[in-house]
Amino acid sequence: MTRLSRMLSSLTPRRGKPDMSIVVVVHNIPREAPRTLFSLSRGYQRHICATDYEVIVVDNGSDPPLDRRVIEETFGPNFRLIRLDAAPPSPAHAVNRGLAEARGEIVGVMIDGARLVTPGLLHFARQGARLYDRAIVATLGWYLGHDFQRWAMTAGYDTKDEDALLSSIDWPQNGYRLFEVATLDESSVDGWLMPVTESNALFLRRELWTELGGLDERFDAPGGGLLNLDTYRRALELPDTEPVLLLGEGTFHQLHGGVATNVAVGCLAESLARWNAHYES
């Protein structure tokens, strides 16, 4: 049994615990994180009560750090912040820390806290997880903007343009209008009814996360490298699992200088070669 498995197994059920936990990792994204967290709040999410879920925000060494009081007072008592001061560059340990703290029966992981979500994500993820005893609930991934962000940036696309896009759809008044100003990302580029290569909001029952052993902390590159793809693959390879893809919901990536999503094409090719070599080793 892994250290994470022991930590998860040692947590005893608490009276009044939430049905769901969502672990969100943030690192140096002061512009994007508040939007992401608002999109997970009861003021935005539909068909779900604040007592039904908790959001565990893991600050993976941000400088300056997120303010615990601001997080909990702004977004509600079902939000809590965990701060990792001596944080490794990969988000793997941060996710595992969040998993160990999670109290819900269904646990979602958002490895990149710069992603907005649609208003029915939590409701339908909960319903999807209940379709099968061993459901793997995934979402399509999108970029804000009308091209892959690394290509759009070469034409001058920046955070001001992204802010204008969100204003043009009056976000967050109707979160489903995000689909109007977004492009499917590489994980989902084959389209609505095709398999995805990773999910930036991945929901499993608690015991499946335990069986999986959490995220593999050997993925120690900044940003995690192929960590998220590996996690999704390993989840699907667990015995007797059933994939569930939420077609009407999604996650939407904001510009923030991500090591994979917002780097020049040439730099990405170098990184992919390095990450693949690391993965094969």
Give the role of each language-model region.
Residues 107:
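Short aromatic/hydrophobic "clamp" motif used to bind/position activated sugar donors
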Residues 7, 29-45:
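Short, well-formed alpha-helical segments that are part of the catalytic scaffolds
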Residues 142-144, 245-263:
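Active-site donor/metal-binding and catalytic loop motifs
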Residues 85-102:
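Glycine-rich, basic loop-to-helix element that forms the pyrophosphate-binding segment
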Residues 57-68, 115:
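A conserved acidic beta->alpha catalytic loop
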Residues 167-204:
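A recurrent flexible, glycine/aromatic-enriched loop bordering the glycosyltransferase active site
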Residues 120-168:
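Conserved donor NDP-sugar-binding/catalytic core segment of glycosyltransferases
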Residues 195-204, 208-213, 219-240:
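A short, conserved alpha-helix in the catalytic core of glycosyltransferases
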